[in-house]
Every structure is written in C-alpha cells, then in structure tokens.
Amino acid sequence: NNLLSDLPSLAIATDRVDREWIERPHRWRVRDIRNFMIVFGLVSSVFDLLTFALLYWLTAGDVEAFRTGWFIESLLTEVGVLLVIRTRLRAWQSRPAPMLLVATILVAIGSMLLPWTAVGSWFGLVPVTATVLLAVVLVLFGYLLASELTKGPFYRWLARGSTAARP
C-alpha cells in the first residue's frame, strides 16, 4: 500500500503552485500545520470508521475480503485526497500537473485491479464482490467531498486566528 501511494506523492514535486501563492510570500507556522493535521485527520478517521463498519457488514467475517476492501479503500482515499488538499482552491479549480494526475489515476486503477492478479494473491488479496467495490467507491467520494467541504471553513478559521494564512 505505502509503495503504491508513494508514486503520486513523489509526483507532487512536479505539481503546479496556485498563482496566489506565487505572487506574494507566505509564512508557514507549525501551529497551522498541526491544526490542519488535526482537522483533516479527524475527517479521515470518521471515514475510516465508516469503512470498517461497512466492510465488516459486507464481508460477513471473510478476513481476506475485508483486508482486500480495506487495501483498496485506503489506497484510493490516500491518493485521492492528495488532489483535494494540494490546493486551497476547490480541487477542480486548480489543475494538477500531468505527472501527478497520471500517477494518481494509474495507482487508483491498479489498486482496484490488483486483487484479481497473481501479484495480488501473493499479498493475500482476493477478488471482492461488486457490492464491496461499490461501497468502497462511495466511501471514497464521500471522503473527498467532506475533505473539500472542510477546506473552506478551515482556511477561513485559520485566517481569523493566524497571520500564516494571509499573505
């Protein structure tokens, strides 16, 4: 999982920076980074718990299917949220660099196909039902939407209490 999610993470180095962040210098503060981690970590944790509950219910005690569903969901959310949190703008208003977008798409597709391959079976992954895949994709979209909707209020809150959010 970590190796695959590292590919889009490495590609972030090729990413575009929003024009607003190039025009004027900005200051980073550890407190602001900590607050970001707390807020978005809580959003992530809520969806992790939802995923665990759904997978527990949908896989009915099939440990391998649960593990595979978790593998797919955790990888999809990890690479998907990168496209959301890489910018303060709405994700669709800030185009990612081609390398970042391609790496993210390839890893997402690969994560969903891997359980049906010999390589996937080496890692204990098993094919899962369409219902499990649908649930994973719905959780993914819910998580990305929640993260996107959290950004605006978070950055407004940060701007009120910190000069780090202002140019």
How should these model regions be labeled?
Residues 1-167:
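C-terminal transmembrane helices and immediately adjacent loops/tails
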